[in-house]
Amino acid sequence: MSSSPLSKKRRVSGPDPKPGSNCSSAQSVLSEVSSVPTNGMAKNGSEADIDESLYSRQLYVLGHEAMKMLQTSSVLVSGLRGLGVEIAKNIILGGVKAVTLHDQGTTQWADLSSQFYLREEDIGKNRAEVSQPRLAELNSYVPVTAYTGPLVEDFLSGFQVVVLTNSPLEEQLRVGEFCHSRGIKLVVADTRGLFGQLFCDFGEEMVLTDSNGEQPLSAMVSMVTKDNPGVVTCLDEARHGFETGDFVSFSEVQGMVQLNGCQPIEIKVLGPYTFSICDTSNFSDYIRGGIVSQVKVPKKISFKSLPASLAEPDFVMTDFAKYSRPAQLHIGFQALHQFCAQHNRPPRPRNEEDATELVTLAQAVNARSPPAVQQDNVDEDLIRKLAYVAAGDLAPINAFIGGLAAQEVMKACSGKFMPIMQWLYFDALECLPEDKEALTEDKCLPRQNRYDGQVAVFGSDLQEKLGKQKYFLVGAGAIGCELLKNFAMIGLGCGEGGEVVVTDMDTIEKSNLNRQFLFRPWDVTKLKSDTAAAAVRQMNPYIQVTSHQNRVGPDTERIYDDDFFQNLDGVANALDNVDARMYMDRRCVYYRKPLLESGTLGTKGNVQVVIPFLTESYSSSQDPPEKSIPICTLKNFPNAIEHTLQWARDEFEGLFKQPAENVNQYLTDSKFVERTLRLAGTQPLEVLEAVQRSLVLQRPQTWGDCVTWACHHWHTQYCNNIRQLLHNFPPDQLTSSGAPFWSGPKRCPHPLTFDVNNTLHLDYVMAAANLFAQTYGLTGSQDRAAVASLLQSVQVPEFTPKSGVKIHVSDQELQSANASVDDSRLEELKATLPSPDKLPGFKMYPIDFEKDDDSNFHMDFIVAASNLRAENYDISPADRHKSKLIAGKIIPAIATTTAAVVGLVCLELYKVVQGHQQLDSYKNGFLNLALPFFGFSEPLAAPRHQYYNQEWTLWDRFEVQGLQPNGEEMTLKQFLDYFKTEHKLEITMLSQGVSMLYSFFMPAAKLKERLDQPMTEIVSRVSKRKLGRHVRALVLELCCNDESGEDVEVPYVRYTIR
């Protein structure tokens, strides 16, 4: 991932870590920053416990320490128009100590274009007072108050962070000077039509604890030289990922023990597997082993005050294609403030007189600017466009700038992530009509309605067009909620004939409330789509939104059929998995509909726009597959907590889900055994043995039996299996080359001894016994003392390691072994399984893993099982929070990123609705608010292919009418002849989905039978599925040869049958 120059780490180093060591360290920095009050935050604030069930996903972004800092920070948000309410919403969801809303203005029609907590009946009322109760509902932990007085110094002194939005420059300078002198953090945010501005001043001594938010890296050491400087070589399994200037610490190094536990050492990267540290020439010889871990060292950064930075600005780039624009807009915004101060209003939309005056003012500002700011020439065209749109107020721009500003507030409170240093300018001029003559002053005049702020930028024609749009929103989670809010604000589907259809089959959970801002605590367990639809109707009563609860996929194509898609103007994805995204992408390509795609991961986000006949599709490029953990690593040779957590998840499935499912199938499906025996490798043996254990060998009758089973299973996994492994591979075992077997990624384990007084051991038994009981419909117990008492009487069989037990060292060995099956053992199992007739009414209860319910023992089992195995292998354990992240495959999320990303999505929506045809009008985007980094690029054009002289892309296809003029359907022979005659293509293979309909190597008898059959009849017979009445056309894939016999790539066929 590329990053901006401003994301480069500021490097610091210090004196020796301890007497006699040659390694420089971060010790001086640690002591230096510890003397500075942490970011000036109030230390006497309430240290309330963090509600992990509410802040779960955000905690994985910020961490507990940063979250505690947020909870001690009071924030003032001044200005409650669209931008101010967006910032307030995000920081209230984030969980700061308290928020005060300040505004002395009253609600106007133009405010309703983007201020989602103002309604038509609020016109004439104070914006802060009206917004306060609606914002207060977002988070019961955050007191929200309204203030309508002046921003006097005594009032400002009560806050740790002050946010000014849509504030005059004179007020910004006055408040900025005061805040800088008092150590109060300041964020200034402003939006003007399609332009946005952000400024940060977090004082002269801000302590930054983590500049990027990434998990500290670690690597296994294979060699350290005795040299000045010493060179560390890591195992070549994976690149170490460190950067020059990073600090690292060492552990488990054998031989060169001076490295173990030393203070963090600054490194210089030499290559992907090597880096230098310090003078190691006087250290002991390196023997083997060791883990090197990155250490996040706090650092101090300094900000200039607003007046000083105004004269000598530093910019964060938002678009490298507009490299000179920030400096121009720095002048332009100062000129705009001057214009507003002189006229008590912004320039009138599309008014040439006002635009000319703003250009003149900008030239005067430039002329008197200091050398650091002064430009050779003022970009008159840019300043004119600023004048044309400055009266506008757009929800998507406010969402983007508001998301960024709220993240900066969180940085100011916590010291987590690199702040914006110090100015950021943004514009989305590509949203304006491609026809530069399309907009006039008359078209942009206010209409005294809720869209005036948007009409000022785009005119009334686009507003009418937006109202008529029919859009399909797939998902009503975090991105879905933000999209619905923006749709309501911009008027999408709010006019005659317009509609937004939203589908989501999920219900609301408490952990959703932290970022899915349309939901409230009293909505928990309700359907997301219904609740979100009702919430946005409050924001704009004119939005015509229909809510569904359907999963998108082949099963719902009778609902989302040809008629449904053909009536749509576009689709917006708000999905959380790649499979569903790719499915929707295929549907959009087939129906030739625009697709707005986006996603977030913590502080990272991306936006992709897919335009028919213009861009590639979402599926045209794919991320590389996630690296999987080798099975033998999981089974026998774990070396990281991720390995033990995955092992624990597999244990959960293999103990509490799969056996119960297999037993139920065995008891109800007479062909289960026959089908199981056809499985590959050792699977038949494993499945039938599990069924035998569940029904015969380990079937419990009482709660006490479940406790006994859990205790026995504990001994099997954490003692007996480890002893067997060490019997096969003793600690001093050597490989065939004479190297130690237990070295590098292989950590030598040790067996554990069960101790009922060990909390972790009892945790395991409690969770395992309760889950085991649940699978049999038995009642469990949460009485730890009673379980401990039961364990005293459990007899554990003596275990002796066996000779001849094969333990596979590599996955290749395992695959070879899987090829052979013990047929006699299978026959024995079939004979000993009880007949289903002898177990009438018996069934088991499979357990689906649910990570977010802390009372169901699921995570209790995972944490205990993983940490016990980690103890076996001397791997550092993981707490419940980290375990839930890894085992539950949780996607970290925070409201700020979602707001910013959806703002960008809706800027693309403006272009789609206008029908922009130039590729460079559209922008795919990537951002990382932690760095901060912003990257925009033109979408890639759809790749072009050719057969003969015919060019085609993924948007093209052959259209074949299946019904002939005589009313009969085309046969396979007629279909093949049609392509030979019409397109000079010889079809060599023809398929529909996974069904092969025709191939050149098909047996002659089968071919003869099919040639005269109608196409749909062949499809139904081969797929063994009857075509539904909703199916009007089939997608057929072809392999073809041209007239010279060469294989050619051709588009798919849309074969119409109705």
From Swiss-Prot:
Q: Where are the sequence repeats?
A: 63-199, 459-611
Assigned GO CC terms: cytoplasm; desmosome; endosome membrane; heterochromatin; lysosomal membrane; mitochondrion; nucleus; rough endoplasmic reticulum membrane
Residue positions, PTM Phosphothreonine? T800
Gene3D superfamilies per UniProt: NAD(P)-binding Rossmann-like Domain, Ubiquitin-activating enzyme E1, FCCH domain, Ubiquitin-activating enzyme E1, inactive adenylation domain, subdomain 1, Ubiquitin-activating enzyme E1, inactive adenylation domain, subdomain 2, Ubiquitin-activating enzyme E1, SCCH domain, Ubiquitin-activating enzyme E1, UFD domain
- EC class of the enzyme, as a word: ligase
**UniProt binding sites for ATP:** A478, D504, R515, K528, D576, N577
Q: Which reactions does this protein catalyse?
A: ATP + ubiquitin + [E1 ubiquitin-activating enzyme]-L-cysteine = AMP + diphosphate + S-ubiquitinyl-[E1 ubiquitin-activating enzyme]-L-cysteine
Which GO biological-process labels does this protein carry?
Answer: DNA damage response; protein ubiquitination; ubiquitin-dependent protein catabolic process
Pathway the protein contributes to:
Protein modification; protein ubiquitination
**The record's account of how the chain is modified after translation:** ISGylated.
Q: Where in the cell is it found?
A: Cytoplasm; Mitochondrion; Nucleus
Record PTM Phosphotyrosine, positions in chain: Y55
Q: Where is this region: 2 approximate repeats?
A: 63-611
What EC number is given for this enzyme? 6.2.1.45
Q: Which keywords does this Swiss-Prot/TrEMBL entry list?
A: Acetylation, ATP-binding, Cytoplasm, Ligase, Mitochondrion, Nucleotide-binding, Nucleus, Phosphoprotein, Repeat, Ubl conjugation, Ubl conjugation pathway
User: Which residues carry the post-translational modification N6-succinyllysine, per the record?
Assistant: K528
The active-site annotation reads C632 (glycyl thioester intermediate)
Q: Which family does it belong to?
A: Belongs to the ubiquitin-activating E1 family.
Subunit and interaction comment: Monomer. Interacts with GAN (via BTB domain).
User: What's the further remark here?
Assistant: There are two active sites within the E1 molecule, allowing it to accommodate two ubiquitin moieties at a time, with a new ubiquitin forming an adenylate intermediate as the previous one is transferred to the thiol site.
Please state what the protein is called: Ubiquitin-like modifier-activating enzyme 1
| The species this protein was found in | Rattus norvegicus
